[in-house]
From Swiss-Prot:
Keywords, comma-separated and alphabetical: ATP synthesis, CF(0), Hydrogen ion transport, Ion transport, Membrane, Mitochondrion, Mitochondrion inner membrane, Transmembrane, Transmembrane helix, Transport
Entry's family note: Belongs to the ATPase A chain family.
Parts of the chain that traverse the membrane: 2-22, 25-45, 53-73, 80-100, 143-163, 164-184
Membrane protein topology class: Multi-pass membrane protein
Domain of life of the native organism: Eukaryota
Locations listed in the record: Mitochondrion inner membrane
Annotated GO MF terms: proton-transporting ATP synthase activity, rotational mechanism
Protein name: ATP synthase subunit a
Length: 199
């Protein structure tokens, strides 16, 4: 079984060309369809054309971190508050800097016809609202991923207790539930970044 024959290599290369090498390869078509679906899900707008790209990139990075951490180390890095806080700060700063460079920022700070006291108090309220966003993103992502992990593991332990360890589909069900939590939380986080960009 350790012998490698020419026909084996030929068949391997023959299959690989359909996956990678042609202009319309199977893998390329699959990736293009998936990315097109993500752009549709994140509802591309003409006012901020890069907002959907940033959201899709955020979604894919978080999904990669979740799956990579879970399948390599059996713990998702999005469940660690340090990782999510740093990622939320970077994402929030990118949205804040995009917002500051737009023309809406001066209208956002002071509206015409308002008194000084009202403008000052509204500025403080808006400032607190802006500064609390990375903390809200951090807590939302961390807690939801941890709660999803705990609930899926509790269900797994409960099913294993009553049905025994002989059912392989219980382990598969627990992994599928974890993956579902990763998809949902990555989507919610990137969707919030998209909404912050479109304000």
């Amino acid at each position: 079984m350790t012998n490698v024959y020419f026909l084996d290599i030929f068949m391997f290369v023959y299959v690989l060309q359909f996956l990678f090498y042609f202009k319309e390869s199977m893998l390329g078509v699959l990736v293009n369809k998936f990315l097109g679906l993500l752009v549709v899900v994140f509802s591309y707008t003409d006012s901020l054309p890069l907002s959907s790209v940033i959201s899709v990139f955020t979604f894919l990075v978080l999904l990669t971190c979740c799956f990579g951490g879970y399948f390599m180390y059996s713990f998702c890095p999005c469940g660690m508050i340090e990782f999510t806080f740093v990622y939320a700060m970077v994402a929030w700063l990118s949205t804040l800097l995009t917002f500051i460079t737009s023309e809406k920022f001066s209208i956002y700070i002071s509206k015409a016809g308002d008194s000084f006291l009202k403008t000052f108090s509204m500025l403080l309220v808006e400032l607190v609202s802006e500064v609390s966003r990375p903390l809200a993103l951090t807590v939302r992502l961390t807690v939801n991923v941890l709660v999803g992990h705990v609930i899926s593991m509790m269900l797994y332990q409960l099913l294993e207790l009553y049905l025994g360890i002989f059912y392989v589909w219980i382990v598969v069900l627990a992994i599928v539930m974890e993956c579902f939590v990763f998809f949902i939380q990555s989507y919610i986080f990137s969707r919030l970044i998209y909404l912050y960009l479109n304000e």
